[in-house]
Amino acid sequence: LPCFLEKTHRFPALELVVGLLLLITSADLGINGRAIFRNIDYATPYMRMDEYVSYLDDNKPLIDDIKASDSGMYRICQNYQLTSNDPMLLGFKGMFHYSSTYTQSINALTSKLGIGQAWLWNTGYGTTPVTDSLLGVKYLLSDTAESSGYYSLKTTDNSVSVYENPSAMEFIYSAPLASADISFTSDPFENQSRYLNNLCGS
């Protein structure tokens, strides 16, 4: 570098060109860096540390209680969220998942069953007792009252309740071979009915 600077110093025009290139490159890196951070903030907004800690303090004990009382294989779903990957944040198997390595067939199925899905992101929004049971959702964390056949287990000071779904199925269950071929419609409730009927072989 000192040798290069010494050579450019002998040629003022070259020194000017190098300086301009350095300035342009620095500006380009700065503008692109700012754009990247703004787009990341748009996709997954930044939050204050106290918001993050408060969310963990409110929700992690609920998850820990569930896992301590039930060591089985099941999903936990929420009707609220902090991030696009709350199950990874809180350490449980859930419905919310954001990944660039998504499986297209899974995303297509959840969308046809009426579950909120947006390209790389699967959610638990829009589930019903039927889809919860089929997908092994045994527990629900809800900040609103649930009355669709779920048992209330616990309500916290911050009005989040834990509900249990007594009809939750296992992650893996057998079904007739014909159930692999289902003709879906544009009606998610009809699709849920067809999916369930095919699983039952009817």
Per-region residue spans from a language model:
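Flexible, solvent-exposed extracytoplasmic
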Residues: 67, 97, 130-202
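Membrane-proximal extracellular/periplasmic loop immediately following the first transmembrane helix
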Residues: 56-64
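P-loop NTPase catalytic cores that bind/hydrolyze ATP
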Residues: 28, 58, 73-84, 133-142
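Flexible loop/turn segments at secondary-structure boundaries
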Residues: 31-34, 41, 82-88, 96, ...
